[in-house]
Every structure is written in structure tokens, then in C-alpha cells.
Amino acid sequence: MQILVDADACPVKDIITKNAKKYGIPVIMIIDTSHELNDGYSTVITVDKARDSVDIKLINMVQRGDIVVTQDYGVAAMGLGKGAKVLNQNGLIYSDANIDRLLFERHLGQKIRRAGGRTGTIRKRSKENDEAFEKALLLFIKPESEGPRDLKI
């Protein structure tokens, strides 16, 4: 098991690294050339700035049982399809039970924006978001004797 992170705009890199170190889990942070990252623990892979290059690299690397951190529903769907455990930066655990709805909502939002509409505002990140993320991450990485490894939603 390893943790693969779509790290370009990921606000929880420190939380991932802290917990991965604690449990001895390798972390791969994937970024494009417009970002720099060195946390002293993670393997950092830098890819071209081309559209979806980080996403494609991540999905090509993921294996069954890996943990994927992404806020991209398309990446989440492909990760689930490859047998990964997938969550976003706010602790939302993607699953077969919710990914179709999330992809459909993304599609509707894109249609509204293309037609000139607005779909909402982005809330400022909170301490509660970080806590929810860490709790969800720990569900996936704690040894079985300490807690569940698989969560069905």
C-alpha cells in the first residue's frame, strides 16, 4: 500500500505526510512544473503542465489497495475502478455508491457554467475540514488491530 496524492492544489499534504510517517507508508506526491514540493519524506514526481498530466500519471501508477487523495471526481472514479481507496481533501470517501452521483453533478455544473451561469462559491478551508480529512485517512491506513481498513458507504 502507498498513498498517491494529486498534490497540485492539495491543502492536506502535511497531514498526509505526518500520518504516513507514523505508519511507515510510502507517499508519492504528483505535481506539475508550476509547483515545487519537498517535505523530506514523500517521493515527488513532477510532470508537464499539460492539462490532466498529473491525473494521468497518478492513475497510471495506482494499484489495488493504494490510497488516492484527489478532489477530481474523474480521478476518483478511475482510482476506484483500479481497486484503490479514494478520498478528497475534506474527508469525503469516494465509493461505488456515490461516485456516479458526484460525476453527474459535476456534469450539470459544467453545463451551467458553459451557459454563463454560476454554480456556487468555494468556502474557506476550516480546521474542521482538516480534522475530517485526517479521520477519514486514518480509517484507511491504521493497522487492522487499531481500526477498519475498508469502509463501505
From Swiss-Prot:
Highest taxon in the source lineage: Bacteria
A family per Pfam: DUF188
Assigned protein family: Belongs to the UPF0178 family.
Cross-referenced HAMAP family: UPF0178 (MF_00489)
Protein name (database record): UPF0178 protein Ccel_2994
Species of the source: Ruminiclostridium cellulolyticum (strain ATCC 35319 / DSM 5812 / JCM 6584 / H10) (Clostridium cellulolyticum)
